[in-house]
Swiss-Prot record:
It comes from Pyrobaculum neutrophilum (strain DSM 2338 / JCM 9278 / NBRC 100436 / V24Sta). This is Ribonuclease HII. A divalent metal cation binds at residues 9-10, 104. NCBIfam families: ribonuclease HII (TIGR00729). Manganese or magnesium. Binds 1 divalent metal ion per monomer in the absence of substrate. May bind a second metal ion after substrate binding. The gene is rnhB.
Length: 198
């Protein structure tokens, strides 16, 4: 039996509009690297879409969770945004078995975050900053970003163009002032209107 490695990453932690998506990819790092996976932010949307399909075909397991803004709010109101990632990452690890997981850590102390995941899941976890250098993490980054981008595109059809959804985007700020604000698509816990994000 081969040694299985997994990677976990997220997309959409910082926006005030839309969901956060956390993804796990378990697969051969060499195979994924040959596909050309890298940090999703460094790829064009078209390239991400192509890689997404290739990842689905090449990986042993791919899964993701969509965390809606209301759920993000329940964690942020209590100052527990990192705990949100911890909880959902643990659930994803249970869905895609591997011998070790490389996780892009939201915590300033990656060892603390990795230890917490190991305690919850009973699996070996290596948490790090800038984890996209690990092919499985880069692949998870791409999966999370593609899924989120698709959901955001659907949301824009429903509520209008709100820009990137990030607090620093002038179009997003303008939309928050004057746009249609369905309660379910906005993270009300963000301090964006006061000029900050959590």
């Amino acid at each position: 039996m081969s040694f299985l490695e997994g990677g976990v990453d997220e997309a959409g932690r910082g926006p005030v509009v839309g969901p956060m998506v956390i993804a796990v990819v378990v697969g051969d790092g060499g195979v994924l690297a040959r596909l050309g996976v890298r940090d999703s932010k460094r790829l064009s949307p078209e390239r991400r879409e192509r890689l997404y399909q290739l990842i689905l075909e090449a990986a042993d397991c791919v899964n993701y969770v969509v965390v809606e803004p209301a759920v993000v709010d329940t964690y942020v109101w209590r100052g527990l945004l990192n705990a949100l990632e911890l909880d959902y990452t643990a659930k994803l690890i249970e869905l895609c078995p591997a011998d070790v997981y490389y996780v892009d850590s939201p915590d300033v102390d990656p060892r603390r975050y990795g230890s917490a995941l190991e305690f919850i899941t009973g699996r070996r976890v290596v948490a790090m900053h800038k984890g996209e250098s690990v092919p499985q993490v880069a692949a998870a980054s791409i999966v999370a970003k593609v899924v989120r981008d698709r959901l955001v595109a659907l949301l824009k059809k429903e509520v209008g163009d709100f820009g990137s959804g990030y607090p620093s985007d002038p179009r997003t700020r303008e939309w928050l002032k004057w746009g249609r604000l369905p309660p379910e698509c906005v993270r009300w816990s963000w301090r964006t209107l006061r000029g900050e994000s959590p």
